[in-house]
Amino acid sequence: MAKKVDKVVKLQIPAGKANPAPPVGPALGQAGVNIMGFCKEFNARTQDQAGLIIPVEISVYEDRSFTFITKTPPAPVLLKKAAGIEKGSGEPNKTKVATVTKNQVREIANSKMQDLNAADEEAAMRIIEGTARSMGIVVE
């Protein structure tokens, strides 16, 4: 018989940098997960994506064992990296902070395709372009 899921914990953690300090420790401690076991496994699985924030969904079972799924980094993180900026515009309608090319948007859309609610590449690109627009990034 399959194990019964007790809780699902969603976190966003920098790749390769999970440690028992907040916010990871308290969130997993409440769920009764072996915190160090999770940190070691997460860091090993994400060490090649250093510098990016990785969303993770941890399924905690009744016997306190766990499995987790890592997702692709959030679109704004990928857009900031592509544009080479620290943060988006405070006033995206008035102040534009950077530009990205259609090819960069296409790459981001393809890498995020599995997590986006889009039927094809064009729809995924429109989602990413909308995110860029709301951050004050111009798409050329």
Curated annotation (Swiss-Prot):
UniProt key word Transport: no
Cellular component aspect of the GO annotation: cytosolic large ribosomal subunit
UniProt superkingdom: Bacteria
Gene Ontology MF, one: large ribosomal subunit rRNA binding
Keywords: Methylation, Ribonucleoprotein, Ribosomal protein, RNA-binding, rRNA-binding
Family: Belongs to the universal ribosomal protein uL11 family.
Protein name: Large ribosomal subunit protein uL11
Lineage: Bacteria, Bacillati, Bacillota, Bacilli, Bacillales
Gene for this chain: rplK
